[in-house]
């Protein structure tokens, strides 16, 4: 792939607890300039959708649901998803209920995600927070995403210790397309995730990744 194709796989991200509209505007500007997607808090979707950077460049707006811990009630996640879509989100990343997954309440967790998927006509990525799961739990989380008809599995929120690993990406990508996120701040790390099978990269360092990348094609 070339640099333009790489950029289209990056969700340039700003999701910190102190995120301001000025920071969102910077991310949107970078996304428009480099051809990336933009992942922003849901509270800024309305304003973001009204900016010329989005309307003129066609930046894909990604937002988050049940973020960052996944412990919202199902009805709240569903409402959040609908509100985000109506405010202009093109895709949503929803956090799986990790505590319930760990207590083997798989049917409840699947229903939780399926409610979100059914509520909106846009792609849904399920954040499973790999760093908090053992191997069996990772596989069960992937099965939840598949059974709920989600479109992607996302490794991490970026709020737990650790982030994406190539080993996890290899396993997760056997279930659904993978968005690797958490700790990806260089071209080499991003490339390693793509080589492991990731389809999308989530990173606050989108510009740095692209500026560090050689303008070459690779398998």
From Swiss-Prot:
GO terms for biological process: 2-deoxyribose 1-phosphate catabolic process; carbohydrate catabolic process; deoxyribonucleotide catabolic process. The keyword Cytoplasm applies. It comes from the Archaea. The active site is at residues 93, 154, 179. Catalyzes a reversible aldol reaction between acetaldehyde and D-glyceraldehyde 3-phosphate to generate 2-deoxy-D-ribose 5-phosphate. NCBIfam families: deoC. This is Deoxyribose-phosphate aldolase. The gene is deoC.
């Amino acid at each position: 792939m070339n640099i333009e194709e790489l950029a289209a796989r990056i969700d340039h991200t700003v999701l910190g607890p102190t995120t301001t509209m000025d920071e969102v505007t910077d991310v949107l500007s970078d996304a428009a300039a480099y051809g990336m997607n933009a992942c922003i808090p849901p509270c800024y979707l309305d304003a973001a959708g009204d900016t010329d950077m989005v309307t003129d460049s066609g930046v894909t707006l990604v937002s988050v649901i049940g973020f960052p811990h996944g412990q919202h009630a199902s009805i709240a996640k569903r409402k959040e998803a609908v509100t985000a879509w109506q405010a202009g989100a093109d895709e949503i990343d929803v956090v799986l209920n990790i505590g319930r997954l760990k207590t083997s309440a798989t049917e409840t967790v699947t229903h939780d995600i399926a409610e979100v998927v059914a509520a909106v006509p846009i792609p849904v990525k399920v954040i499973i927070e790999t760093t908090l799961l053992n191997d069996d739990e990772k596989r069960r989380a992937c099965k939840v995403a598949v059974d709920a008809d989600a479109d992607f599995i996302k490794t991490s929120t970026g709020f737990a210790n650790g982030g994406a690993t190539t080993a996890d990406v290899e396993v997760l990508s056997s279930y659904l397309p993978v968005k690797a996120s958490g700790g990806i701040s260089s071209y080499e790390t991003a490339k390693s995730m793509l080589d492991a099978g990731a389809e999308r990269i989530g990173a606050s360092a989108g510009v740095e990744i692209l500026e560090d990348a050689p303008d070459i094609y690779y398998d």
